[in-house]
Amino acid sequence: MAYTRSKIVDLVDGKIDPDTLHQMLSTPKDPERFVTYVEILQERMPWDDKIILPLGPKLFIVQQKVSKKWTVRCECGHDFCDWKDNWKLSARVHVRDTPQKMEEIYPRLMAPTPSWQVIREYFCPECGTLHDVEAPTPWYPVIHDFSPDIEGFYQEWLGLPVPERADA
């Protein structure tokens, strides 16, 4: 079932009714939905570079207009790093690793024990948007969420040509 552009706008804005949302999530995707979704996001960005793949509500892999280089970018326009790198290593990080810091977000007796678990909050260094939160053991390295197979996604799933990339 193909959804109207206005329904996808409602989805992006978080204004879609629960029944339609459930139906959208549980049924096969219509072929043009991703393109429409990206067009809607693109219109809302303060920059002209092409969105290749949304990574989160305000985090994207983009193709820089002039160089054709792919980077991870915040909605505000801050480029974190090359698309293949872990963007979290270029983010501003707040680590909650003391009882006092944990109690800022948890009730006292419900907070994790900092010697067993820390909370890492990853922010855009330019606009301060919170992009991700991890809750690993204190010694665990920064988690690289995933490395998308953009070529496979575009060619095999969407049936679209892969956008040009400078380092391809």
From Swiss-Prot:
Keywords: ATP-binding, Ligase, Nucleotide-binding. Its cofactor is Fe cation; Mg(2+); Zn(2+). Zn(2+). The heterohexamer contains tightly bound iron, manganese and zinc ions. InterPro entries: Aceto_COase_bsu/gsu. Optimum pH is 7.6. It holds the Pfam family Acetone_carb_G. Its EC number is 6.4.1.6. It catalyses: acetone + hydrogencarbonate + 2 ATP + 3 H2O = acetoacetate + 2 AMP + 4 phosphate + 4 H(+). Signal peptide: none annotated. GO terms for biological process: cellular detoxification of acetone. It comes from the Bacteria. One of its GO terms (molecular function) is ATP binding. Heterohexamer of two alpha, two beta and two gamma subunits. This is Acetone carboxylase gamma subunit. The lineage of its organism: Bacteria, Pseudomonadati, Pseudomonadota, Alphaproteobacteria, Hyphomicrobiales.
